[in-house]
């Protein structure tokens, strides 16, 4: 077993989810590649006296289900999984697929059925507000190809950023959080960009390995109607 996998599993259980004895955790595995990590998460869950529940899916199987998906089907699936999710204290979701565009040809209306009738009740209404959750991807050849590098090189990069000391990072973020929370006006200046806005009384939220791995940001939002200026994007954007 790769020691880096053991470290990641330990951090997910102890730091991200802070699992305690008797708590129940839903471990969602998408793809076969994350299995070594999922097995280690199960072991670590048992070590703390918590109870693991595992559900596994692949993009290719989900594609076949979605191509013929009906509202009745998605409602029943949601009803079953809502009952399970309501009993969970935590959720760990790991995705690792070979083909990142496996579901590219699934009709939009089928995706919409899943989003409305399954994802919304199970995840948005129960999992997100009522469990300790963390989600991440597992390194695969598809991800390495997207990064234009070898799998080994990508794995090194992946574990270096996923196995950071996020507790230490969170402590270091406090100074930025304090600064942002007492700031009113913000101005961003770069090539072809000069934009200003207010963040007064908008909370600054730090993200340090609690819900996403890898992680590392402090975010806020501008006060509505306070934005003025010009911004230029270096990549295509819907907006």
Predicted regions and their residues:
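Active-site bordering "gate/hinge" segments
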Residues: 1-230, 235-239
């Amino acid at each position: 077993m790769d020691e880096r996998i053991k470290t990641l599993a330990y951090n997910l259980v102890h730091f991200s989810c802070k699992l305690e004895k008797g708590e129940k955790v839903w471990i969602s595995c998408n793809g076969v590649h994350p299995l070594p990590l999922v097995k280690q998460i199960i072991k670590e869950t048992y070590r703390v006296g918590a109870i693991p529940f595992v559900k596994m899916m692949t993009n290719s199987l989900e594609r076949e289900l979605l191509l013929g998906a009906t509202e009745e089907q998605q409602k029943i699936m949601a009803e079953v999984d809502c009952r399970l999710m309501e009993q969970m204290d935590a959720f760990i979701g790991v995705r690792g697929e070979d083909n990142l565009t496996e579901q590219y040809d699934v009709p939009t209306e089928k995706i919409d059925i899943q989003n409305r009738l399954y994802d919304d009740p199970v995840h948005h209404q129960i999992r997100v507000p009522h469990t300790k959750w963390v989600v991440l991807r597992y390194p695969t050849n598809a991800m390495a190809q997207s990064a234009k590098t070898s799998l080994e090189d990508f794995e090194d990069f992946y574990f270096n950023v996923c196995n950071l000391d996020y507790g230490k990072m969170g402590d270091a973020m406090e100074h930025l959080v304090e600064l942002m929370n007492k700031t009113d006006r913000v101005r961003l200046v770069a090539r072809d960009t000069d934009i200003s806005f207010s963040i007064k009384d908008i909370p600054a939220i730090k993200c340090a390995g609690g819900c996403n791995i890898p992680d590392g940001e402090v975010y806020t939002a501008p006060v509505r109607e306070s934005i003025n200026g010009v911004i230029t994007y270096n990549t295509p954007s819907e907006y």
